[in-house]
Amino acid sequence: MELYEAISYRKSIRNYSNKGIKSSLMEEVKGLCNDITYLNEDLNIKVHVIDRGHLIQFLMGKACEVKAPHYIVITSNKGDNYLENIGFVAEEIVLRLISLGLATCWLKCDLKREDVLEFIDLEVVDTDDEEYENKIDAPYAIIAFGYAEKEESLFRSVNSDPDRKRLKKVCKKIDRKWFKVLNSVRIAPSIKNIQPWVFYSNENGFDVYEKKTKKSIANESKISMGIALKHFDIACKNFNMDIKFENIGAKRKRGKNYLMSIVDNEKNTTKE
């Protein structure tokens, strides 16, 4: 299954078999977790496979609502749009796992750096370093994965429409060229299904905004924005559409924060 197809078929699985995945498959998972790309190359994002799921369950306690045999923990230092970049990285991992026939579920991460040091190797930063707070790595996202319980359907029916906003709520003034790409964004998962993304068309592509949300889920909302950008990126690659992500600034909009712009390179080439 291609990543673009996985976008339409994916769904969150909350019930897992206790059986661990095969060792050969686990090696494949670890390999793809080491092969990641993100938008801000100054960040130090890493994806850690925790094959002993009980470690995460113990640390999270009652907050661990999804019991799975394995988990993935994503760590990063703080930097420009680090949470959005985490979402961008992790959603591709999720879609690749789905393509391998594995169930997945995003979890809210309340773990701290000191919680995971015993089983995750994080870089040491001198506490006297003036940039200590921005350089130090910490966990920000968790993904449960494994084999789904027998009664759980791994994939969503291609004909079913998830509980999402209509496309006109996602983007204003849609060019038909972008319809399928933006629909891939529309069906992206988000914290509490808030779907915080809004795309505004401009002569060069799109300006992307995040709707302001409650402080209690602000971090997860930013991660959700990164997930939406990854869906946009995958769909563009599927249709051979040449784009780039840039932070070029845009007008302020009430109740929304500007994230970045998406430039249609094909349109700019035509202009030249």
What feature does the model see in each segment?
Residues 1-272:
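Acidic, surface-exposed loops and disordered segments
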